[in-house]
């Protein structure tokens, strides 16, 4: 009986950790998307030939607005797509977790 409880506890903790990691990553990517939005808005008001710098693999690379803007917009779209997929995964995992709890008659007891 004790071993069975340990297995259930381990599985419960695993689900909770996965859900927490997904939520954290979604929030982090949301902040990245917001930063991209601010930079894109700022660059749209700038002259197309104006110099700007962007980080590529830890190095600052000089560019201009007209070159950097499409790259930033593409990255923002990719981030939005990733967030959407991660939200779907989060919802699916939460449903699996609830089903697992129901199937195994798991009740959370807090001290």
Curated annotation (Swiss-Prot):
**Keyword field contains Chaperone:** yes
Q: Which GO terms describe its molecular function?
A: protein folding chaperone; tubulin binding; unfolded protein binding
Keyword Lyase present in the record's keywords: the answer is no
User: For this UniProt entry, what is the primary localization, expressed as one broad class?
Assistant: cytoplasm
Q: Which domain of life is it from?
A: Eukaryota
Q: Which InterPro entries match?
A: PFD2 (IPR027235), PFD_beta-like (IPR002777), Prefoldin (IPR009053)
Signal peptide (residue range): none
- Location in or out of the cell: Cytoplasm
Keywords attached to this entry: Chaperone, Coiled coil, Cytoplasm
In its UniProt record, which GO terms are filed under biological process? protein folding; tubulin complex assembly
CDD domains for this protein = Prefoldin_2
What is a single cellular component term in the Gene Ontology annotation? prefoldin complex
The record's section on Pfam families has: Prefoldin_2
Q: Which residues form a coiled coil?
A: 1-36, 72-92
Extra facts: Present with 1660 molecules/cell in log phase SD medium.
| Family (UniProt) | Belongs to the prefoldin subunit beta family.
Q: How does it assemble?
A: Heterohexamer of two PFD-alpha type and four PFD-beta type subunits.
Q: What does this protein do?
A: Binds specifically to cytosolic chaperonin (c-CPN) and transfers target proteins to it. Binds to nascent polypeptide chain and promotes folding in an environment in which there are many competing pathways for nonnative proteins.
Name assigned to this protein: Prefoldin subunit 2
Instruction: List the source organism.
Output: Saccharomyces cerevisiae (strain ATCC 204508 / S288c) (Baker's yeast)
Gene name, Swiss-Prot/TrEMBL? GIM4
